[in-house]
């Protein structure tokens, strides 16, 4: 109640003091203060974050596992681009205070009638050179938030952004792949592989879904797919029509090599995994088989809207996504933030969630 009165008083003064929690160097957070000016006439909403989720990209920054030139250019910076919150101000009075929303980290400054917003070089992305959601309040354009279903578990919804990445990749795959869907292979037994498997099993119910992974205890979580296979023991008879690579890192080279070897002619390979270093690809076999390689990165408004519609249409998808939730941390201090990030470094599977009380 006191917090709401404080917010209302600040809004009446048409200025807000916002505390932003930035990574200033590897493993070191500091709080800084910035003002939010409500005098200007630009349409905006202000969101109070409620739950956030740590992503692999956040960990790379936190641990300093990026090129030193990139770190010096982008830091200090607030981390995290996966978050849900509640509206505390809407300049157009379209959304009521307290409305629960998911926030879209991609911020386009221009539009294009062909190229998607997440591929425009003019777009900005939160927690990648621009402050992320580790703030007291987030100022956004009205089209950068999507209203959530009323009964949704906000802690599970916190990693909706990662779900939209998979939704976006599947849409691109649909638009470019030949219409042969007897079998689909997914490489990767981590968070993104799990989400992609959940979605493909729902969107292609009659297609055989096979997940290829390295670790048996992770693969055991994919009990809803048709078959799981360890990458060190792939049967010679296995063939797939199309593939989704969700491995990333050094392992993406082996994954792509295996895909090329067992995929049927004219199949499509959707690449979702991120590798910091260049990898080798057997282009001879890509040409010989007539394969299509589809790159996907991030997501935009349409992908968020489609994902929320999937939540409403298939509530069982949310139940499966809930199994991805790992440990939840209550964040009241910067020390709590450090504890959560340190935990996530050694977290082998699942999404670490932050309840944002700070």
What is each PLM-predicted segment?
Residues 1-15:
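N-terminal amphipathic/basic-hydrophobic helices that include classical n-h-c signal peptides
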